[in-house]
Amino acid sequence: MDKYCELIRQRYSQIASGELGYIPDALGCVLRALNEVASDEALSESVREQAAYAAANLLVSDYVNE
């Protein structure tokens, strides 16, 4: 967990403790978040590109591993 930012570690702790709800469709949750970042024109192009690349890699890995 040390390689992740403080906000991610906080949310992890909250989900693990039951304070926040766990989402069983973790891949769908991640893809929705990455899609939101990738389509937000207020963000820098490099941040949007990173989100799009990460989402595309997840989609490919999901289909390749089936």
Curated annotation (Swiss-Prot):
<comment type="similarity">
    <text>Belongs to the UPF0253 family.</text>
</comment>
<dbReference type="Pfam" id="PF06786">
    <property type="entry name" value="UPF0253"/>
</dbReference>
<protein>
    <recommendedName>
        <fullName>UPF0253 protein ESA_03148</fullName>
    </recommendedName>
</protein>
<dbReference type="InterPro" id="IPR009624">
    <property type="entry name" value="UPF0253"/>
</dbReference>
